[in-house]
Amino acid sequence: MKKPIVAVIAGGYSGEHSVSLKSAAGILSWLGSEPFSAFLVLIERDRWSVRVSEQREVPLDKNDFSFDLDDERIRFDYAYITIHGTPGENGLLQGYLDMIGIPYNTGDTLVESLTFNKYVCNRFLSGFGIRIADSMRLTGRDTQPDVADLTARMGLPLFVKPNVGGSSIATTKVVEAAQLLPAIGQAFSEGEEVMIERLICGTEVTCGAFLRKKEVVALPVTEVVAHNEFFDFDAKYNGAVEEITPARISDEATRLIQTMTARIYELLNARGIIRVDYIIEADGIPTLLEVNTTPGMTPTSFIPQQVRAAEMDMKEVLCTIIRDGLNETQ
């Protein structure tokens, strides 16, 4: 029986392109050569290709998600999406894969388009009793809002960030009114919508979850202590942060975070691995920051840390997700 052929899809069209490549390298190293044949698939605006060796890439046929190698036509059996941003995190790639009948590791088009829009996703989850921060959304018609009106409504300090996207790119902490319009302009440079959110004080934590045999497994909680003003791109990827797994919180708080994460997973009808970020405020209740459906997967990323803390094996977690996805289509 031939080994299933898995595409680890990376790249994409956003500012998180380089992060995606690092995540893909991590996934490929964990998967190894057994029990699947895994290839890196690179998606660029002008080219989709398959890396068949360190020095060689061949074109990917978008008609059926296949490629030619040594006079043999090879069609992928499964897609492991690790694109951070468009088109892998907003439902576009999922729709394409659905059309050609290739199973994949994330939620479907509806789930991904919902979770990619931070404002809409948080509002949706708040309807089920999940606490969220006070926030508002600006569209392209609101590039020059009334600063006095906005600060009177939201107060200061605030966070201003693109409403879609991740890695805290173009995110600004605004502590005085004069900083607001430049921050909004910077956020609009990364997308067509901007989210403005009230600053929340407390302990920042994050918790991953995945589905194993139709049961949601919530991983140990990580505490995030940023050495910068907040957990920005520099903190995430240049080491300006302390990540403590398991988090230095009570057992009760840990159980609450894990229960909330599992519930969010189920409410969203998620698949694969997700990560949910929170702030635990002074009253002990977690406030949702955002849901990430294609979290970073480098060896030092949160999810691998949490898997190790749970005394699980990263390869086995990935293989479980892929096997379950393949079995659903058989």
Swiss-Prot record:
Gene Ontology MF terms in the entry: ATP binding; D-alanine-D-alanine ligase activity; metal ion binding
Database matches in SUPFAM superfamilies: Glutathione synthetase ATP-binding domain-like, PreATP-grasp domain
Start and end residues of each ATP-grasp domain: 122-323
Q: Name one GO cellular component term.
A: cytoplasm
Give the record's pathway: Cell wall biogenesis; peptidoglycan biosynthesis
Residues the record lists as binding Mg(2+) 2: E290, N292
EC assignment: the record states 6.3.2.4
Record flagged with keyword Cell wall biogenesis/degradation: yes
The domain of life for this entry's organism is Bacteria
Localization, UniProt:
Cytoplasm
Q: Which InterPro entries match?
A: ATP-grasp, ATP_grasp_subdomain_1, D-Ala_lig_Van_CS, D_ala_D_ala, Dala_Dala_lig_C, Dala_Dala_lig_N, PreATP-grasp_dom_sf
The UniProt entry's GO biological process terms, in alphabetical order, are:
cell wall organization; peptidoglycan biosynthetic process; regulation of cell shape
- The answer to whether the entry has keyword ATP-binding is yes
User: Which Pfam family is an annotated match for this chain, by its short name?
Assistant: Dala_Dala_lig_C
Reactions catalysed, as given in the entry = 2 D-alanine + ATP = D-alanyl-D-alanine + ADP + phosphate + H(+)
The record's family statement is: Belongs to the D-alanine--D-alanine ligase family.
PANTHER family according to UniProt: D-ALANINE--D-ALANINE LIGASE (PTHR23132), D-ALANINE--D-ALANINE LIGASE B (PTHR23132:SF23)
Which protein is depicted?
Answer: D-alanine--D-alanine ligase
| Lineage of the organism | Bacteria, Pseudomonadati, Bacteroidota, Bacteroidia, Bacteroidales
Query: Which gene name belongs to this protein?
Result: ddl
